Amino acid sequence: MKLSNKTQALHDLIAPAVQACDVNLWGIEFIPQGKRSLLRIFIDKPVDETAEPVLNEDGETELGRGIGVQDCVRVTQQVGAILDVHDPISGEYALEVSSPGWDRPFFQLEQMSAYIGQQVALRLISAVENRRKFQAKLLLVDLENEMIQVEVDGKHVLEIDSHNIDKANLIYQD
């Protein structure tokens, strides 16, 4: 779960602007696509179980948690201005801002800690037991040793080095 140098540089550049919008930068994806690249920014807010419902600027009721359209608009404006000034992406690009959603991608090992016991989808760089793709139950996140432990097929436990994880996301379950 390591960001490329370009993605890390973009992350470092936009993080203060996102934070200024009172949301958390969950992660970013930078996808170079020839003449037109894509910069996708995921933002999140901590859950506030005690929040009272309020009307937002669009007249919608918000429960004090989750990302709303106005959050995405604010971040898009702030980050867009930063990118216009610093011009870190050569050529044209599209900027997308959204919440991580129910099937949220994980960008850092620490993010997975809150989802122990949940189902995750993993794509590995190098095969483990002749497989690169897994859907498994997350059992353990070991930050010190930079590894996770998952249960595959309800019975088989694997330890996976975080540096071997190419992509990971939560599997939404109703």
Swiss-Prot record:
Keywords from the UniProt entry: Cytoplasm, Ribosome biogenesis
InterPro entries: Ribosome_maturation_RimP (IPR003728), RimP_C (IPR028998), RimP_C_sf (IPR036847), RimP_N (IPR028989), RimP_N_sf (IPR035956)
Any one Pfam family match given in the protein's UniProt record, by short name: RimP_N
Claim: Cytoplasm is one of the keywords in the record: yes
Subcellular location: Cytoplasm
GO CC aspect terms: cytosol
BP terms from Gene Ontology: ribosomal small subunit assembly; translation
Lineage: superkingdom: Bacteria
Family classification: Belongs to the RimP family.
Biological role stated in the UniProt entry: Required for maturation of 30S ribosomal subunits.
Entry protein name: Ribosome maturation factor RimP
